[in-house]
Amino acid sequence: FTSTLYWYNEPYIFLTPDGSYYDYSGIIHEFGHFLNSYAVPSDLIFGAADYEICEMQSIGMEFMATHWYEELFGPDTARMLLLDSFFNSIINVMDGAMFDEFLQRVYAEEDLTKERVCEIYAELYKEYGNDVYDGYDKEWISVPHNFDSPFYYISYCMATIPVLGLYSELQTS
């Protein structure tokens, strides 16, 4: 993740590499946040700039980097990773919409209980076509954005769609 070191007013990337492809995609994604934070500084009181713009830069960086996948990983792996990028984009759009709808419904409830929150999530989880597993109704708890940045998740959805349009444009020009 990328954060701001407010004492220095500088962005900083925190990454725990594990030797996989995700080291590359992680640093590329976070570098998009870094550039955004560097160009449009955030502050301790008001936080980050527009989330959709931050995510557009990060997801955009990921897709721009696919141009070098073959050189970095070889042709077979490059194709697989490109397909993985597109698959993750579909997931970003679906999850972004689902989590936004989830939070809208949660915040609209009058007498909310933790059981009701889990029920709402379970309903939406199934409605969005996800595979049910033991404990899926509590999956929302493991998403930090639900607590520290409510309604952030729609940013992934809103950023992915124009980025895919730009990526398509890059491929034809």
Where does each model-flagged region fall?
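Cation-handling catalytic/transport regions enriched in His/Asp/Glu
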Residues: F1-S173
